[in-house]
Amino acid sequence: MEYTIGDPSSHLLNKKIFYDKVNSDKLKFIDFLLEGNAFSSLKTSFEENILNNYSKREIQLVIVYASKKKIGDEHRNLVQNVCYLDYSIVKYFQVISKIIKKSAKYEFFDFLKLDFDKIGESIKRSSLTPTEQFQGHILPEERSCFQAGFKIVTFYMDANALLKRAYVLRNDGWRNFGNVELYQRLLISKKIKAMRKYLHEQSRVFVNNIIVTLSSKHIKLYDKDKNLLTVDSSGCIKEADTKAQPALIEIENKPNIIGIIDGQHRSYAYHEGDDVYEETIQKLRTIQNLLVTGILYPENITTEARLRFEAKLFLEINATQQGASSSLKQTIENILNPNSSTAIAKHIITKLNESGPLLDKFEEHWYESDKIKTASIISFGLKPLIKFSGSDSLFKLWNNSQKEKLLEKEFNDQLLNEYKEFCVNEIRNLLIGFSANITKENWAISRKNSTAILSVTTINGLINCLRFLIENNKTGDSNYYRKCFEKISGFNFKSFKSSQYRKMGESIYKECFIE
């Protein structure tokens, strides 16, 4: 575990040679730790708790780098084969582990990219990919009315088996699908405790079924006579029956393969805890009494299409419930309509926050109240800049012969991603040139000190300046902007009110780009 409280950029780069050396021969590094006098306490702990059960070759070694300050993508790309434990991820696992206790280990193992088959007792198994079988039924698309290739399987599963394999796309979690927002909320401690009390007192299952998604590459299906059903990459079963049929469902024993769409609280109520209910729930955890309805999607489906399908399903289940907030519905609508200006703008904000001059400046998580809020930047800054029309839009500037296809109803994820990347690069170039002419003391969030200039108003002013540049054919690269913004030193940012984005943008344009 490597951690720092200072600026991680130079600190991380200085560690690259050491990290590469460790990763090149992990066994040799373990020997070094155990043989050196400086690590005698570590050696004692290893001998007492680990080496009496496992060999050194069975030890998995991961370099974990923790910094409270966010590390930009440009530095992560230089120092690879390191697990970056960002502060937001620390906060996430802190919340999750307080609620579901030891059961949080499965998700943490997945975050560390540890091989599930090489952890604990799994190492001793002779089978390379252990599986478990569950009795159930297959409902083909003719009966479910889902699109071709999507099957519904229902089966009973014990909570222990489900929790080992499950994942939930929580919006404050660590999973990152790049172009797709995540939407499910964090677990609610009060709700989990109430459900555990119910399980303890009633000693019976919840009557509702758990809705999940599965990929056909992680399961095998057998008919009632235990004959293997062949599922091709498009999700079609060669020996298909158009009626519901009994089946044996064999699922790999791997983490992160069953996505819980509805029922995360009912599932995680069975977690491995330390409360007064654990003795009862421990017995229930291994009983196959959870009714699971799984949507089996084809192996050849793209990640974006799969996540859109899951989001639509989640919205259909939760839209009429009291707890479905407008922000949740908006997030899912952005997933279902990725070509919308709001969805594109939110993606741009995320990318600007990951690297460049605005690294870690935007509010992303519930505890980041001291950072820049993004709602007004999305609505009044980015949306007019990235719209698919107008003489002042990045769409006009984008030199792509296929760009008109984005106006069609059919999704083109690759083309859309190219446009998003273009927008991010153009905005970042402007910011690089601008920030090069601002002192470090002033390039800070304005709420923290009187001389700082970073605020919603300033960022929207710069975005509006870029619109003027596009309209007047005065755009360029970061070096061009750096030269032009040399005139910005005497600009009075504080004289503009919070709603005067356009006025500030025009003033910056005239000050720095008009001879």
Residue ranges and their predicted role:
Residues G6-E515:
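Accessory terminal alpha-helical modules
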Residues M1:
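Short acidic loop-to-beta-strand element that houses the catalytic metal-binding Asp/Glu
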